[in-house]
Regions:
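Membrane-proximal basic amphipathic "stem/tether" segments
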Residues: 2-3, 319-327
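A conserved beta-strand-loop-helix scaffold within acyl/acetyltransferase catalytic domains
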Residues: 4-54, 61-69, 117-143, 147-253
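Short alpha-helical functional segments enriched in proximate histidine and acidic residues
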Residues: 20, 102-105, 270
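Short, high-confidence coil segments that cap the C-terminus of an alpha-helix
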Residues: 43-45, 105-108, 218, 273-276
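Aromatic (often tryptophan-rich) hydrophobic motifs at membrane interfaces
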Residues: 60-61, 82-84, 88, 93-100, ...
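Short, flexible, mixed-charge acidic loops at enzyme active sites
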Residues: 69-74, 295
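Short, solvent-exposed loop/turn segments at the edges of secondary structure
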Residues: 74-78, 141, 307
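A gly/proline- and charged-residue-enriched helix-loop-helix capping module
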Residues: 76-122
């Protein structure tokens, strides 16, 4: 008989779920149900909760289903198995086996995981990387993230310094704002439409709603020249990591005004100088198989260096491979 029990998440579990997220060793506010459910109409939620023999919640899996595949999570930047800091490797192996057996009974064929990058963890949390190896999981994608260690910075390049000085010479001013309207409507939406014929993942209504739920985790910084908005960035703040979620500016912002260099330097050197990591994000295309070289170099010229985020495809039936691991 298993020492763990798996059950589907239900709306009545929200407080229990959110309390667990707040104390887990590898979670951020993106796993809070107030964040996950802003777009619940787009996904068929199939999140899981795992309890031990004492009926204590020890792990959760933010997830949704598409046919016979369970994803964790296509609607989030990252996903994977979220763990209590008290669980140890042997328990995580048994928890994973229990999850896969549960999914097999529910006639799932695959579990796809989008692992949370290590910098977001509060404690070492590579259990699932090891377990994916044990399960002979397919590494379906690997992205390269450019990350700056704010506490131990590699010197910024001379090119970036020139951009920063250009921003100062052009009289640029950065202000934190609570209203996203001007940035969204005047810059972000038009630019995404013109360049990529797409829209922001979050609508103005959605980002405003999320800001109301997470006022300390979602921040907006606009850049002004002569009181006119010329650029801006929407930042997601987690315990260890500062991550620009959206960045946009007018046609003069990047080159003529030095706005992008000026804005990022301001955030790193002033607003978030006491934080741990600044995650510039990925520069990948084609499911991680190609890198936008100039974009990644721009991030590296701030002193950022590369870590990876792994995506795994697990065959549910392979749970038997975990039977003989513990000796």
């Amino acid at each position: 008989m298993s020492n763990f029990r798996v059950q589907r998440y239900h709306s009545s579990d929200s407080n229990h779920w959110n309390t667990f997220v707040a104390n887990a060793k590898n979670a951020t506010f993106l796993f809070h149900k107030d964040f996950m459910e802003y777009h619940k109409d787009r996904f068929d939620d199939y999140s899981l909760m795992i309890f031990n023999v004492n009926n204590k919640l020890v792990a959760i899996l933010p997830a949704h289903k598409v046919d016979s595949v369970l994803y964790s999570h296509q609607g989030l930047t990252y996903g994977g198995l979220v763990l209590s800091s008290k669980v140890i490797l042997s328990e995580v192996i048994l928890i994973t086996k229990c999850i896969l057996e549960f999914l097999e009974k529910k006639e799932f064929s695959k579990l796809n995981l989008k692992i949370i990058p290590s910098i977001y963890n509060c404690f070492p949390s590579d259990e699932m990387e090891y377990i994916c190896f044990l399960l002979e999981a397919k590494l379906s994608r690997r992205d390269a993230l450019a990350v700056l260690d704010i506490t131990n910075q590699i010197p910024i390049s001379r090119v970036r310094k020139r951009g920063i000085e250009k921003g100062k010479a052009n009289g640029l001013v950065v202000k934190e704002e609570n209203d996203f309207t001007s940035f969204w409507n005047e810059l972000l939406i038009p630019n995404l439409k013109e360049r990529y014929n797409t829209k922001p993942v979050h609508s103005l209504f959605e980002i405003t709603y999320l800001k109301s739920k997470f006022p300390n985790q979602i921040k907006q910084y606009n850049v002004y020249q002569d009181d006119k908005i010329v650029g801006g960035v929407t930042v997601f703040v987690t315990d260890n990591v500062i991550h620009p979620q959206y960045i946009s500016g007018n046609k003069a912002f990047n080159n003529e005004l030095g706005g992008l260099d000026f804005l990022y330097h301001y955030l790193i050197s002033n607003v978030y100088k006491n934080e741990k990591y600044f995650d510039f994000g990925i520069s990948n295309e084609n499911q991680g198989k190609q890198v936008n070289e100039s974009l990644h170099y721009w991030k590296e010229s701030f002193g950022a260096r590369t870590i990876v985020q792994n995506f795994y495809e697990i065959e549910v039936k392979n749970h038997s491979l975990l039977d003989t691991v513990l000796i």
